[in-house]
Amino acid sequence: MNRYCFTLRVRPDRLGEYKARHQAVWPEMLEALRGAGWSNYSLFLSDDGLLIGYVETPDLDSARAAMARTTVNGRWQQEMSQFFVDLGHGHADDNFALIPEVFHLEDQLARLRHRPGNTEEAFHV
């Protein structure tokens, strides 16, 4: 499973409504995301409108393409596009900026555990 992080910018005057919409995402949208391979998907929103998303999926391009083929995603993206800054001509799911991962605790611990000469006792504090 691959981990992806992305950013978008929500209009500061629409933060409250954006949050409210995400407290009751349409059930068919939730099912479409799951069916398209989106897992452990979270959104974080700062007071200045910076939106940070995190998702795990085997392949983000495939997961995005699967969502693009659903009618519910088109409706959701159309509904939500009013909340974002500088989307141009597309929807949010076409315009987010990916952020490269630079650290993952479990990956580094796993590499340490598999180094020659390391024992499991060395990792208990």
Task: Show the residue positions of the predicted features.
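Active-site-flanking beta-strand signature of metal-NTP-handling nucleotidyl enzymes
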Residues: 4-9
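Short amphipathic alpha-helical segments
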Residues: 14-39
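Intrinsically disordered, low-complexity acidic/polar segments
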Residues: 15, 52, 62-64
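Short intrinsically disordered coil segments
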Residues: 23, 69-71, 115-119
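Short, glycine- and small/hydrophobic-rich beta-strand elements in well-ordered beta-sheets
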Residues: 30-52, 56-58
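An amphipathic, aromatic/His-enriched active-site/gating alpha helix that lines ligand/cofactor pockets
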Residues: 36, 57-95
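Glycine-rich beta-strand-turn "strand-cap" elements at beta-sheet edges
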Residues: 45-46, 78-125
